Amino acid sequence: MQLFHLCLIIFCSCPTVQASKLCLGWLWGMDIDPYKEFGASVELLSFLPSDFFPSVRDLLDTASALYRDALESPEHCTPNHTALRQAILCWGELMTLASWVGNNLEDPAARDLVVNYVNTNMGLKIRQLLWFHISCLTFGRETVLEYLVSFGVWIRTPPAYRPPNAPILSTLPETTVVRRRGRSPRRRTPSPRRRRSQSPRRRRSQSPASQC
């Protein structure tokens, strides 16, 4: 029971609207998904293995290097920036709470249990959130959604019937361009034929006028 109350504090201590909604959803049985408004879902993210996501420190360094000005700006940039701010703040509060609990629990076993719970469960959720929103800002939301769907299809396909390598997010735009180039010749081929067929007509229609 003490662990239940501690987990409740961990879930509800984040001073963000999104974290509060997650806490209320857990208590009241509401179906609240932090990815739903972005076209994804927790289930879709769950297809990616836990070791796929970089560490929280690496993700925070990436967010700071690429989007620090936008994250610190008082202006509203995009929903992804807002969600990224909330995830960063939530992780900071979780670390503060975990440090406080670790320093005040006398039982080493209980202290290790709390630290492992935060790092394993909440750490994975934060890594997923950070990765998703950083990737949306870097590659575009549609590309990230296409990647999640592609990976989900790949991982659920029996090994004998799927490519040996999983899809790679950074190569998806190149794949999309290749597909578009493969379709474009079919759209461009009629135009030269029309120009070739129309040019003699113009000369024939103009020839009587020139003879007159």
Curated annotation (Swiss-Prot):
Quote the cellular component terms of the Gene Ontology held in the record.
Answer: extracellular region; host cell; host cell cytoplasm; host cell nucleus; T=4 icosahedral viral capsid
Residues in sequence repeats: 184-190, 191-198, 199-206
Principal subcellular localisation of the protein: secreted
Start and end residues of each stretch annotated as 3 X 8 AA repeats of S-P-R-R-R-R-S-Q: 184-206
Q: Which residues form the signal peptide?
A: 1-19
Q: Where in the cell is it found?
A: Secreted; Host nucleus
Instruction: Give me the residues of the propeptide, which is removed upon maturation.
Output: 184-212
Compositional bias ranges of the Basic residues kind: 178-205
Provide this UniProt record's keywords sorted from A to Z.
Disulfide bond, Host nucleus, Host-virus interaction, Repeat, Secreted, Signal, Viral immunoevasion
Alphabetical list of InterPro entries matching this protein? Hepatitis_B_virus_capsid_N, Hepatitis_core, Viral_capsid_core_dom_sf_HBV
Annotated GO biological processes are:
microtubule-dependent intracellular transport of viral material towards nucleus; symbiont entry into host cell; viral penetration into host nucleus
Q: How is it modified after translation?
A: Phosphorylated.
Q: Where is this region: Disordered?
A: 165-212
The record's note on quaternary structure and interaction partners says: Homodimerizes.
Question: What job does this protein perform?
Answer: May regulate immune response to the intracellular capsid in acting as a T-cell tolerogen, by having an immunoregulatory effect which prevents destruction of infected cells by cytotoxic T-cells. This immune regulation may predispose to chronicity during perinatal infections and prevent severe liver injury during adult infections.
Name of the protein in its database record: External core antigen
Q: Which gene encodes it?
A: C
